[in-house]
């Protein structure tokens, strides 16, 4: 897998026009894009289809969670759209229903473990008795047992998660920041280089690229950092 296949640019912008502008500026530098609630509710599903038709890959970040039948119905529809990845919260019954619904489609289902904007104190406030690391590892095991394609977690847990999931399942990591970058609302973060070294298979990067004066150059710098981690002899 090349660095271009591992980097996912998060199109966390309010309008399709802004998303189209970013994709145009980045050009062929990036292959993979993430689309979430904000853009979906502004007409982003049609835009996602357009990206797929143009040869790009789309990670639909919907974080689904509902009764089994509703999750399965949603996954079936999304699988027909040609998306490459889809998120749902890593609850066992929902994951099992989603896996069955996506069977044979090629859609990679990802279990969301603990948001990278949350730390142990946030989990306590939300009523969880577990710390972030323990909860991530438990949900990673449940995702593997359910037959999911991988999980979403902080790079801080990537090494331990990789031991649970093995070499083939996806470990998708948000909260990626180049050295010295503003952390924003993220709490459990890592640089692109360190995240790849830790065992992450895909990195999701939004603000450091989409808010850059030159998004293409910003993406190129992150890709270079990822390449250094993958091929250290070329440094």
Curated annotation (Swiss-Prot):
GO-annotated biological processes: 'de novo' pyrimidine nucleobase biosynthetic process; 'de novo' UMP biosynthetic process
Alphabetical list of PANTHER family matching this protein: OROTIDINE 5'-PHOSPHATE DECARBOXYLASE
Function statement: Catalyzes the decarboxylation of orotidine 5'-monophosphate (OMP) to uridine 5'-monophosphate (UMP).
Family according to the record: Belongs to the OMP decarboxylase family. Type 1 subfamily.
Record organism: Agrobacterium fabrum (strain C58 / ATCC 33970) (Agrobacterium tumefaciens (strain C58))
Keywords per UniProt: Decarboxylase, Lyase, Pyrimidine biosynthesis
Pfam families xref list: OMPdecase
Enzymatic reactions: orotidine 5'-phosphate + H(+) = UMP + CO2
Top-level taxon in the UniProt lineage: Bacteria
Protein name as annotated: Orotidine 5'-phosphate decarboxylase
GO cellular component, as recorded: cytosol
InterPro entries, alphabetized: Aldolase_TIM, OMPdecase, OMPdecase_AS, OMPdecase_bac, OMPdeCOase_dom, RibuloseP-bd_barrel
Subunit structure: Homodimer.
Binding site residues for substrate: 12, 34, 61-70, 116, 177, 186, 207
One example GO MF annotation: orotidine-5'-phosphate decarboxylase activity
Involved pathway(s): Pyrimidine metabolism; UMP biosynthesis via de novo pathway; UMP from orotate: step 2/2
């Amino acid at each position: 897998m090349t660095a271009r296949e591992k980097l996912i640019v998060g199109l966390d912008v309010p309008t399709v026009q802004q998303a189209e502008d970013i994709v145009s500026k980045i050009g062929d530098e990036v292959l993979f894009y993430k689309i979430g609630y904000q853009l979906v509710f502004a007409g982003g599903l049609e835009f996602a289809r357009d990206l797929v038709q143009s040869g790009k890959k789309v990670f639909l970040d919907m974080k689904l969670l509902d009764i089994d039948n509703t999750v399965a119905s949603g996954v079936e529809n999304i699988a027909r759209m040609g998306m490459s990845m889809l998120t749902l919260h890593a609850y066992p019954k929902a994951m099992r229903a989603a896996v069955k619904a996506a069977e044979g489609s090629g859609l990679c289902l990802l279990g969301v473990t603990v948001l990278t904007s949350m730390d142990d104190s946030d989990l306590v406030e939300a009523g969880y008795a577990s710390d972030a690391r323990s909860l991530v590892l438990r949900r990673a095991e449940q995702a593997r047992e359910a037959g999911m394609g991988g999980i979403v977690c902080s790079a801080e847990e990537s090494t331990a998660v990789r031991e649970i999931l093995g070499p083939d399942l996806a470990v998708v990591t948000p909260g990626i920041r180049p050295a010295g970058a503003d952390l924003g609302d993220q709490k459990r973060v890592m640089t692109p280089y360190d995240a790849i070294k830790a065992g992450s298979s895909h990195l999701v990067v939004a603000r450091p690229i989409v808010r850059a004066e030159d998004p293409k150059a910003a993406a190129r710098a992150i890709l270079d950092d990822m390449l250094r981690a993958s091929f250290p002899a070329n440094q």
